[in-house]
Amino acid sequence: MLAVAGLKAAYGRIPILHGIDLNVAEGEFVGILGHNGMGKTTFLKTLIGLLRPTGGSIELNGKNITRMPAYKRNLNGMGYVPQGRDIFPNLTVLDNLRIAFAMHKVEEEKVLEEVLEVFPRLKPLLERSGRVLSGGEQQILALARCLCGSPSLLLLDEPTEGIQPSIIEEIIEILQGLRTSRNLTIVLVEQNLDFIASLSQRVHIIQRGQLVNEVSPDQLYNPELVREFVGMGG
């Protein structure tokens, strides 16, 4: 599904990613865990095409997309939900969804029904402005917008930030359901140990722009590993 080899990226003259290698199989959920400033968001931005790599390659379903623009990656099955809620706050929930329908040229009535089946929380909110939604509701809307295009690979950047625990549990259930119903592949970056352990089949630790270790979800609670690689231990 996704093959990343020797990926490097920089902001100006400051290198951020230092040769990342990662292979993700179809239907796999892979987590990337690490401190702020270690390159998690930069890695996702480089994968989706918002930041041009300075070295290495990215392949999606056997196709080299290293130089492909972000919008084409989106149309070729790669979805991205950035940190901080990717919605239009001045528009209603329904109009936010309609933008995604138009972008992906899908039938509104059919896809809206499918969206509300997966995200029932949005049904009574369709006429509300995005700005009045809670942080959790905004995140669910951002996720729903992204999935309107039926991506095969979904990139999630810290989706639990600032969200109440009940909606975090709801998002976990939604994503687990999509794994079964759509065989969705996910690359998830997070600092929430419980969230990443609940969803990921394997977890990579990122440190100073490199993937330095791979662990199973049940190893995340090893205090020595957490302190050594992430600094989140007690």
Residue ranges of each PLM-predicted region?
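The feature captures the beta-strand-to-loop junction immediately N-terminal to the Walker
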Residues: 33-35
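Conserved ABC transporter NBD signature motif
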Residues: 56-64, 76, 108-110, 117
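ABC ATPase NBD coupling module
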Residues: 64-84, 112, 124-127, 220-226
